[in-house]
Amino acid sequence: TLDNIDYNRLNMSNVERIEIVKGAASSLYGSNAVGGVVNIISKVSAEPWTVNLNGRYGAYNEQRYGGTIGFNVGKFNSVTNVQHTQVDEKDLADGKTNEETEDWAFKKVYGDKTWNFKERLVYTANDHLKLTARAGYFFREREKSQTSKDRYRDFSGGVKGNYVLDKDKDLEIAYSFDQYDKSDYLPQDANDVRDYSNVQHSVHTFYNHTFVGKHILTVGGDYMRDYLMSYQFANN
Protein backbone atom coordinates (compact mmCIF):
# COMPACT_ATOMS: atom_id res chain seq x y z
CA THR A 1 0.00 0.00 0.00
CA LEU A 2 1.01 3.64 -0.54
CA ASP A 3 3.93 5.05 1.46
CA ASN A 4 4.58 1.90 3.48
CA ILE A 5 8.22 1.20 2.59
CA ASP A 6 10.14 2.29 5.69
CA TYR A 7 13.80 2.61 4.73
CA ASN A 8 14.65 3.51 8.32
CA ARG A 9 14.45 -0.22 9.02
CA LEU A 10 17.71 -0.69 7.11
CA ASN A 11 20.75 -0.48 9.38
CA MET A 12 23.62 0.24 7.00
CA SER A 13 26.28 -0.09 9.71
CA ASN A 14 25.66 -3.84 9.68
CA VAL A 15 25.92 -4.27 5.88
CA GLU A 16 28.89 -6.06 4.32
CA ARG A 17 27.85 -5.66 0.66
CA ILE A 18 24.87 -5.11 -1.64
CA GLU A 19 24.18 -7.34 -4.63
CA ILE A 20 21.87 -6.53 -7.57
CA VAL A 21 20.51 -9.56 -9.42
CA LYS A 22 18.89 -8.72 -12.77
CA GLY A 23 16.06 -10.71 -14.27
CA ALA A 24 13.60 -13.19 -12.82
CA ALA A 25 14.86 -15.13 -9.81
CA SER A 26 11.72 -16.67 -8.33
CA SER A 27 13.23 -20.11 -7.82
CA LEU A 28 15.91 -18.65 -5.53
CA TYR A 29 14.16 -15.73 -3.82
CA GLY A 30 10.43 -16.46 -3.91
CA SER A 31 7.50 -15.69 -6.18
CA ASN A 32 7.84 -11.90 -5.77
CA ALA A 33 11.27 -11.86 -7.44
CA VAL A 34 9.95 -11.65 -11.01
CA GLY A 35 11.94 -8.64 -12.21
CA GLY A 36 15.10 -8.65 -10.13
CA VAL A 37 16.48 -8.74 -6.59
CA VAL A 38 18.46 -6.38 -4.38
CA ASN A 39 20.36 -8.47 -1.84
CA ILE A 40 21.57 -6.68 1.29
CA ILE A 41 24.20 -8.97 2.82
CA SER A 42 24.86 -8.44 6.53
CA LYS A 43 28.29 -8.80 8.10
CA VAL A 44 29.72 -12.11 9.30
CA SER A 45 32.11 -12.40 12.22
CA ALA A 46 35.43 -13.82 10.96
CA GLU A 47 37.50 -13.24 14.12
CA PRO A 48 37.08 -15.08 17.45
CA TRP A 49 35.77 -11.86 19.05
CA THR A 50 34.97 -8.46 17.53
CA VAL A 51 33.54 -5.25 18.99
CA ASN A 52 32.70 -2.11 17.03
CA LEU A 53 31.31 1.15 18.43
CA ASN A 54 30.33 4.13 16.29
CA GLY A 55 28.74 7.53 16.67
CA ARG A 56 27.83 10.62 14.68
CA TYR A 57 26.55 14.12 15.41
CA GLY A 58 25.27 16.56 12.80
CA ALA A 59 23.02 19.50 12.03
CA TYR A 60 19.50 19.67 13.48
CA ASN A 61 20.75 17.71 16.49
CA GLU A 62 21.16 14.61 14.33
CA GLN A 63 22.64 11.82 16.44
CA ARG A 64 23.52 8.21 15.70
CA TYR A 65 25.01 5.71 18.13
CA GLY A 66 25.57 2.04 17.47
CA GLY A 67 27.52 -1.04 18.35
CA THR A 68 28.23 -4.52 17.04
CA ILE A 69 29.45 -7.55 18.98
CA GLY A 70 30.44 -10.72 17.14
CA PHE A 71 32.14 -14.01 17.86
CA ASN A 72 33.29 -17.03 15.88
CA VAL A 73 34.01 -19.83 18.32
CA GLY A 74 33.92 -23.52 17.48
CA LYS A 75 30.73 -24.36 15.63
CA PHE A 76 29.01 -21.07 16.51
CA ASN A 77 29.10 -17.72 14.73
CA SER A 78 27.10 -14.76 16.04
CA VAL A 79 26.64 -11.07 15.22
CA THR A 80 24.56 -8.74 17.43
CA ASN A 81 23.91 -5.17 16.29
CA VAL A 82 22.21 -2.26 18.10
CA GLN A 83 21.63 1.26 16.75
CA HIS A 84 19.86 4.39 18.02
CA THR A 85 19.22 7.55 15.99
CA GLN A 86 17.43 10.83 16.56
CA VAL A 87 17.01 14.14 14.75
CA ASP A 88 15.05 17.35 15.29
CA GLU A 89 12.47 18.61 12.80
CA LYS A 90 13.56 20.61 9.76
CA ASP A 91 11.45 23.55 8.62
CA LEU A 92 11.68 23.96 4.84
CA ALA A 93 9.19 26.84 4.49
CA ASP A 94 11.09 29.91 5.76
CA GLY A 95 9.66 29.63 9.24
CA LYS A 96 6.05 28.83 8.28
CA THR A 97 4.40 25.89 9.99
CA ASN A 98 2.87 23.04 8.03
CA GLU A 99 -0.63 24.22 8.91
CA GLU A 100 0.06 27.69 7.45
CA THR A 101 1.00 26.44 4.00
CA GLU A 102 -1.30 24.90 1.42
CA ASP A 103 1.06 22.12 0.35
CA TRP A 104 1.95 21.46 4.00
CA ALA A 105 3.14 17.89 3.49
CA PHE A 106 6.33 19.11 1.82
CA LYS A 107 7.16 22.07 4.07
CA LYS A 108 8.47 20.30 7.14
CA VAL A 109 10.50 17.17 7.87
CA TYR A 110 9.39 15.91 11.25
CA GLY A 111 11.90 14.95 13.89
CA ASP A 112 12.06 11.34 14.97
CA LYS A 113 14.00 8.75 16.92
CA THR A 114 14.67 5.09 16.17
CA TRP A 115 15.92 1.92 17.84
CA ASN A 116 17.15 -1.05 15.82
CA PHE A 117 18.20 -4.47 17.18
CA LYS A 118 19.50 -7.36 15.05
CA GLU A 119 20.86 -10.81 15.93
CA ARG A 120 22.07 -13.63 13.69
CA LEU A 121 23.37 -16.96 14.98
CA VAL A 122 24.91 -19.64 12.76
CA TYR A 123 25.56 -23.21 13.91
CA THR A 124 27.73 -25.38 11.66
CA ALA A 125 27.05 -28.92 12.83
CA ASN A 126 29.44 -30.58 10.38
CA ASP A 127 30.64 -30.37 6.78
CA HIS A 128 27.12 -31.15 5.55
CA LEU A 129 24.70 -29.29 7.83
CA LYS A 130 24.50 -25.58 8.72
CA LEU A 131 21.66 -23.93 10.67
CA THR A 132 20.98 -20.18 10.79
CA ALA A 133 18.61 -18.25 13.07
CA ARG A 134 17.93 -14.51 13.04
CA ALA A 135 15.74 -12.04 14.93
CA GLY A 136 15.17 -8.30 14.80
CA TYR A 137 13.17 -5.47 16.35
CA PHE A 138 12.71 -1.94 15.02
CA PHE A 139 10.97 1.06 16.60
CA ARG A 140 10.52 4.59 15.24
CA GLU A 141 8.61 7.50 16.72
CA ARG A 142 7.92 10.62 14.66
CA GLU A 143 7.19 13.91 16.42
CA LYS A 144 4.16 14.93 14.35
CA SER A 145 2.73 17.29 17.00
CA GLN A 146 2.53 17.77 20.76
CA THR A 147 -0.81 15.95 20.85
CA SER A 148 -0.01 13.06 18.50
CA LYS A 149 3.04 11.01 17.53
CA ASP A 150 3.43 8.46 14.73
CA ARG A 151 4.89 5.13 15.83
CA TYR A 152 6.30 2.38 13.63
CA ARG A 153 7.33 -1.10 14.80
CA ASP A 154 8.76 -4.12 13.05
CA PHE A 155 9.30 -7.64 14.39
CA SER A 156 11.21 -10.09 12.21
CA GLY A 157 12.76 -13.52 12.51
CA GLY A 158 13.64 -16.65 10.65
CA VAL A 159 15.39 -20.00 10.58
CA LYS A 160 17.23 -21.69 7.73
CA GLY A 161 18.85 -25.06 7.20
CA ASN A 162 21.42 -25.90 4.51
CA TYR A 163 22.31 -29.53 3.87
CA VAL A 164 25.03 -30.61 1.42
CA LEU A 165 24.18 -34.08 0.11
CA ASP A 166 27.47 -34.35 -1.77
CA LYS A 167 29.75 -32.07 -3.80
CA ASP A 168 27.13 -31.73 -6.57
CA LYS A 169 23.88 -31.59 -4.59
CA ASP A 170 22.54 -29.39 -1.79
CA LEU A 171 19.18 -28.63 -0.20
CA GLU A 172 17.90 -25.51 1.61
CA ILE A 173 14.76 -25.09 3.70
CA ALA A 174 13.85 -21.75 5.31
CA TYR A 175 11.07 -20.00 7.22
CA SER A 176 10.78 -16.25 7.77
CA PHE A 177 8.39 -13.96 9.65
CA ASP A 178 7.85 -10.22 9.47
CA GLN A 179 5.29 -7.95 11.13
CA TYR A 180 5.26 -4.20 10.44
CA ASP A 181 2.84 -2.05 12.45
CA LYS A 182 1.87 1.63 12.51
CA SER A 183 0.09 3.39 15.34
CA ASP A 184 -0.90 6.85 16.59
CA TYR A 185 0.32 7.62 20.09
CA LEU A 186 -1.69 10.18 22.08
CA PRO A 187 0.49 11.41 24.98
CA GLN A 188 -2.35 13.11 26.87
CA ASP A 189 -3.98 9.77 27.74
CA ALA A 190 -1.06 7.42 26.92
CA ASN A 191 -3.18 5.72 24.27
CA ASP A 192 -1.44 3.86 21.42
CA VAL A 193 -3.90 3.15 18.57
CA ARG A 194 -2.72 0.73 15.88
CA ASP A 195 -4.16 1.47 12.43
CA TYR A 196 -1.88 -0.52 10.13
CA SER A 197 -0.44 -4.03 10.34
CA ASN A 198 1.24 -6.19 7.70
CA VAL A 199 2.13 -9.75 8.77
CA GLN A 200 3.97 -12.16 6.49
CA HIS A 201 4.85 -15.82 6.98
CA SER A 202 7.03 -17.37 4.28
CA VAL A 203 8.40 -20.89 3.75
CA HIS A 204 10.65 -21.88 0.87
CA THR A 205 12.79 -24.79 -0.17
CA PHE A 206 15.04 -25.44 -3.13
CA TYR A 207 17.35 -28.14 -4.39
CA ASN A 208 20.51 -27.51 -6.46
CA HIS A 209 22.18 -30.08 -8.70
CA THR A 210 25.45 -29.23 -10.46
CA PHE A 211 26.26 -30.93 -13.78
CA VAL A 212 29.74 -31.14 -15.31
CA GLY A 213 31.04 -28.82 -12.62
CA LYS A 214 29.42 -25.63 -13.98
CA HIS A 215 25.77 -26.15 -14.99
CA ILE A 216 23.32 -25.82 -12.09
CA LEU A 217 19.73 -27.03 -12.06
CA THR A 218 17.62 -25.41 -9.33
CA VAL A 219 14.17 -26.68 -8.36
CA GLY A 220 12.21 -25.01 -5.59
CA GLY A 221 8.95 -23.77 -4.22
CA ASP A 222 7.64 -21.24 -1.72
CA TYR A 223 4.51 -20.49 0.26
CA MET A 224 3.56 -17.09 1.70
CA ARG A 225 0.71 -16.02 3.95
CA ASP A 226 0.21 -12.24 3.82
CA TYR A 227 -2.16 -10.43 6.19
CA LEU A 228 -2.87 -6.70 5.85
CA MET A 229 -4.95 -4.35 7.99
CA SER A 230 -4.81 -0.70 6.93
CA TYR A 231 -6.43 2.67 7.59
CA GLN A 232 -6.39 3.05 3.79
CA PHE A 233 -9.14 0.43 3.42
CA ALA A 234 -12.77 1.36 4.01
CA ASN A 235 -14.37 -0.27 7.08
CA ASN A 236 -11.05 -1.88 8.02
Language-model segments: which ranges?
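Hydrophobic, lipid-facing positions within transmembrane beta-strands of outer-membrane proteins
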Residues: 36, 49-51, 63-67, 115-119, ...
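Outer-membrane beta-barrel domain signature, especially the mid-to-C-terminal portions
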Residues: 5, 93, 104-109, 148, ...
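Face-selective signature of the C-terminal outer-membrane beta-barrel domain
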Residues: 79, 122-139, 152-236
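Short, glycine-/polar-rich solvent-exposed loops and beta-turns at beta-strand/coil boundaries
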Residues: 1, 30-34, 94
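Short acidic/polar hinge/loop motifs at secondary-structure boundaries
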Residues: 1-22
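Periplasmic-side early beta-strands and strand-to-turn transitions of outer-membrane beta-barrels
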Residues: 27, 39, 47-48, 56, ...
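Transmembrane beta-strand segments of Gram-negative outer membrane beta-barrel proteins
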Residues: 16-17, 42-57, 77-78, 171, ...
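Transmembrane beta-barrel outer-membrane domains
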Residues: 8, 31, 58-62, 108-114, ...
